[in-house]
């Protein structure tokens, strides 16, 4: 009997993009179900009653929540394809450290670029650039964060890359000028079929931001 895999997601979510990419990397067929986050569906509320957030991966009726946990789950359930996490315990721990760093740091500062104004906006932009520089330092001259192999940390971060042009537009700055190696890394990642299929067009994200502000009641002149 074939596995039933359902993904409850929202197209601009950089967290959902992670799960899409992980599934694509493993060639796992899945039923993508777009969610309205302002009118949450019964299945989303049933499958993630604690946080009521996307993405939710449903495997044979069992929900798995939180995107980084989903990447690990996918890697363990479908191990035959190229592993997403290193087998070495230390390298695995390091990958998880950087995944956690991305989760805790990147979104919070990036959100201030399009969702705040004045001093808060400028502080968010400054912190965001500093965070990207920290990540660029970890990347160094490697092809991917894990070396020559695309994996966990790349998947954790690459969804934000689809938002980079929006951050630049609403923040009036150039990420490439600040972090050229990180931009080169993003371009390499997008050449992968799994990433290209999973990331939305940057222009679509830019057009979505004013709509998102309106939905959230954010007024920025």
Curated annotation (Swiss-Prot):
Residue list for modification N-acetylalanine: 2
Phosphothreonine: modified positions: 149
Any one annotated GO CC term: cytoplasm
Keywords of the record: Acetylation, Cytoplasm, Detoxification, Phosphoprotein, Transferase
GO biological process, one term: toxin catabolic process
The GST C-terminal domain, residue ranges: 88-208
Stored CDD domains: GST_C_Tau, GST_N_Tau
Binding site for glutathione: 13-14, 39-40, 53-54, 66-67
Gene Ontology molecular function terms on file: glutathione transferase activity
Gene coding for it: GSTU25
Domain GST N-terminal: 3-82
Top-level taxon of the source organism: Eukaryota
SUPFAM superfamilies the UniProt entry points to: GST C-terminal domain-like, Thioredoxin-like
Location in or out of the cell: Cytoplasm, Cytosol
Entry EC number(s): 2.5.1.18
Sequence similarity: Belongs to the GST superfamily. Tau family.
Name of this chain's protein: Glutathione S-transferase U25
Entries under PROSITE patterns matching the protein: GST_CTER, GST_NTER
Catalytic EC class: transferase
Organism: Arabidopsis thaliana (Mouse-ear cress)
């Amino acid at each position: 009997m074939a596995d039933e895999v359902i993904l409850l997601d929202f197209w601009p979510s950089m967290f959902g993009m992670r799960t899409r990419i992980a599934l694509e990397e493993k060639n796992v067929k899945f039923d993508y179900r777009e969610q309205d986050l302002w009118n949450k569906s019964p299945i989303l509320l049933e499958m993630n009653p604690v946080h009521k957030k996307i993405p939710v991966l449903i495997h044979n009726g069992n929900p798995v929540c939180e995107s980084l946990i989903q990447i690990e789950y996918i890697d363990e359930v479908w191990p035959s394809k190229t592993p997403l996490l290193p087998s070495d315990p230390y390298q695995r721990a390091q990958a998880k450290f950087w995944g956690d760093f991305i989760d805790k740091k990147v979104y919070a500062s990036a959100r201030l670029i399009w969702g705040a104004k004045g001093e808060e906006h400028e502080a968010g932009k400054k912190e965001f650039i500093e965070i990207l520089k920290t990540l660029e330092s970890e990347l160094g001259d490697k092809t991917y964060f894990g070396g020559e192999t695309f994996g966990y940390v790349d998947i954790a971060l690459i969804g934000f890359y689809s938002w980079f042009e929006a951050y630049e537009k609403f923040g009036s700055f150039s990420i490439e000028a600040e972090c050229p190696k990180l931009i080169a890394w993003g371009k390499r990642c997008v050449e992968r079929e799994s990433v290209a299929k999973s990331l939305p067009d940057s222009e679509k994200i830019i057009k979505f931001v004013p709509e998102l502000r309106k939905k959230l009641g954010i007024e920025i002149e």
